[in-house]
Amino acid sequence: MGTISDKLMRIINTKEDIRQALISKGYDIPTSIPFKEYAKMILDLPCNADSFPDIEGIVARYSASGLTNEQMAANPVWVDKTGNGYDLQLKNFSWGGMSGVGGYVDNWNSSADWAINSYWVNSHTDHKLQFITASSVVQARSNNIYNAENVYKNILNANGLTEAVNKGSVKALKIIATDPITSKAIKTFSFETDGVIQISFDDVLQDYYVDYFLYGSDTKDIDITIEQLPLYPGFILGDGVDDFAVTEKELNFEDTYTVYTAFIPFQNDPTRNMILCGADSKKTFSMQYSSLVYVSFIAGNNYYINADFVNGLNLFACKRNGNNICIKNLLTNKVVTGTCGDWVENAGPYYLWKNATYASFAKAAIAGQTICNGYFSTDEDDEKVLDWYKKQYPWLFPDQAWTVVGKTNEDEDRATIANITGNGNDLVLSNFGFAEGSGYGLYAYNFNSFELRDNVVKPTDVKKDSFRIIGIGSNGNVLVLSNTSNSAAWKIRITGMKEGDGCIVGNANKSGDYIKIIKDGIYTFQKQYAATSINGIWYNSSQEVDVLVEQIPEYEGYLVTDGVDDEVRSAAFTLNEDWTIVGNWEFITNENKNAGLTKVYSFYLYNRDYGIFVYEYLNAGQGFSVEDVKSLKAICSDGRIYLNDWQEIRNNIEQEATISKGVMAIGYFNRDFTKMAFKNLGIYNNQLLSKDDCIKAYNYLQTLKSK
């Protein structure tokens, strides 16, 4: 059990934490001030001040909240919050990109990845660029080459841009996909105002590098900052290659202990074992996983139990009391129990992202860990820990959440979208065709409806969205499949072509109505034809052929409703007076339909030819229009709405609170239907998230997959 000395040290360190927080708020706090005097100033502290619950036996505690890459690069030590000296020495971290604090798309400190022109860029960190001079040349350029298989995406925040543009010092911030051979711009995003910037070159099919270009006339009277937003704020990310942390001081476990760990596991190779943390796995304690299905708690050699992951954030308590062990998922309240062998002495250091036994580095984001020695925690303790994390990271705890990323029209469970939280309230799909404009992705064609030709090269393994071409060519253009159409809308990926082969896509009977392909790649072709044209694919080869042709849909990674009879609905759930909804969805037609995203007695988001009609039951029956937009990033029950650029608009009609207990409907309402694309959604009950937390919630949802 924790000693009196341990408790006194926790009190002393808590006092110092509060003192430092007050100093950061502008107070002059001498070290001699009585502890009780802090109460007069404590209300001015931010609500997320680190006040971890006082649980028996805490000997070491780590929290990544508030850390920065700059701070950790200067002193790579993860301080033990208890003051007991079990500080973690962090080894091999880059302190930028996806190795370090926060998780950023780019590491602007890496000269291998980025060329930063220091003449124009006054200063930069791993995730921030500061400009004091506009230019007619590129200020920052990626050394990495991107393409359709490796798309450049980022979420940024610009400050100082609006002022500089208004006074004529700067024309715009441009972010450009540039051809690496010709140096010509392929696609350009241009921004003239402060705020959140979202970049995705997902429609650029060829190779490109990325330029950041603050365009102006060499003026020096500006101060503009471009900052990447982290994907995992409040976490430290290990890269799964060689990043790890270790104590210098021995942390010796007793035969009774509890370890709380908050983390997000990553995995791209299910055959590879990943050690999340531990001491000597043959003696005392270790956690590991090899897939995103479950985590193993190992309490000595060959004694282990497994617990299921949830999607994204996981919060587990691993407990031992003599020969009894259990692992509890605090998010789902599910407990797995087991037994283990006799206690083995275990003097030695403690590790994160590996253990003392194996150097199998975990690719994981860790928010924090708490180790209680000599204590088997109670359910009440567990609830306190869960509540603490909810207050520290509110955006990570939706009450309802769904994503369709990773689902396909061929999945056995394609008509169900699992709830990310693990609460079982899955979305159920009805009447979907799972082809063309009804299902996962918006496909131009259903290849099963084409006329298939049985020639020397011919189609096989034909699916709705793909087929293979096989055979031995006769050195002429051979029609593989076709349909009669007045238009072509092809975005396809071709793999398996050999040198000397050729593929014609479109209307081969008329010059200019087709494209000719001679190598593997992704190709786009759109053309209007005469009504009787033959739209198809021809293949030319003099050798054996085995080529795969796949359609790439519009709205890839989205569920698309057809606006005819497609329905998506949840089971009934309660939404109280205060709530926040965050998500990625879009109406894809301009029409006036009383359908879209609805939950009776809480909210109704209807499609309109001018934009979106928002009707909240809280507003006593009064709705309002949001023009020139087809999607919203977030909506709050206090009247706040956030547009795609995170501009805030507000409905100031007096609120009349109510509670709803019905289902949520997507793409329809009553007997009205509308076309929309749905990617993800998170619903936070009893929470009015701030704008910053809405942004964090949105960014977090974009990182999740359905499986």
Would you name each region that the model predicts?
Residues Q139-I145, L237-E250, K283-F285, G300-I305, ...:
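Secreted extracellular polysaccharide-interacting domains
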Residues I298, T337-F376, E656-K679:
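Extracellular glycan-interaction patches encoded by glycine-rich segments
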Residues A64-S65, N166, N252, T261-N268, ...:
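Solvent-exposed strand-to-loop "edge" motifs in beta-rich extracellular domains
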Residues M1-C47:
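Short, low-complexity N-terminal tether/leader segments at secretion or assembly junctions of large
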Residues Y294-C318, G338, K510-I517, G611-K633:
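Short, aromatic/His-centered strand-loop micro-motif at the edge of beta-sheets
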Residues T3-M9, N13, L43-S135, D179-I181, ...:
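Extracytoplasmic low-complexity segments
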Residues R272-S296, F587, N592-L618:
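Glycan-recognition/cleft segments
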Residues S169, D179, F309-C326, E627-N644:
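Localized edge beta-strand/strand-to-loop motifs within extracellular or lumenal beta-rich domains
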